Amino acid sequence: DGTHNTRELGGYETTDGNKVKWGVLYRSDKLSDVSTDDQEYLSSLGIKNVIDFRSSNEKSEDPDLIPDGMRYIQLPIEADGAIRPKVEAMMRGQDQGDLGELLVEANAEFVSKYKGVYKDFLETLANEQKPSLFHCTAGKDRAGFAAAITLLAVGVPMETVINDYMKTNEYTKEFVDDYLKKIKLYSLNQADVDQLRPIMGVEERFIICLLYTSDAADDRYRG
């Protein structure tokens, strides 16, 4: 109930005919609003590690509510800082533009600036060998890239990886629609919510521009 983009990454077929094991890896948005029932459910899944990609400020504002017995691992990635002023201006109806293109530029830092963090993430998964959940705030950009390189590393085809990335739009549709209605209302109908929608979801161009670069797809990520 307290998350909008939580799902398992098991069951995908790999290029060598195997399948990604069920009950091992989960991706999510922030865990700051989970209920007691949610926490009990997470415990029932056998999750042992929670990996948080959020910045210090994000974690301070919305600390995770993690069940006892789970290890909390912090791998912070600053995200969207450069485009936040423009987003806020658009929410007030004071600016226009292609937020999707801005997000492409912001996400490019996952490769150019935070490659070491993602390498640490993959090494953590490999070394721990325990059921793990990883997340950022919305569970779509930082966590979405983490899911993509993990699936690629175990041999899941690129097309399947992209399809998993795009599932965020299905999982978050109701939440995003409601949120954008509120923005429209609070801005006295000045905000162009169609301009804002790209930053609330995902588009193929967001992930393709990362996965088809030599840096993102090379052996240093695949492990």
Q: Which positions does each model-derived feature cover?
A:
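Short, cationic motifs built from Arg/Lys/His that form the positively charged side of catalytic pockets
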Residues: 7, 24-27, 54, 142, ...
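Cysteine-based protein phosphatase catalytic domain of the PTP/DSP
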Residues: 28-126
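Substrate/cofactor-recognition hotspot
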Residues: 139
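Conserved beta-strand segments of alpha/beta enzyme cores
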Residues: 24, 71-73, 160
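Cysteine-dependent PTP/DSP-like catalytic domain, specifically the C-terminal lobe
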Residues: 116-134, 144-211
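Catalytic-loop region of hydrolases
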Residues: 1-22, 33-49
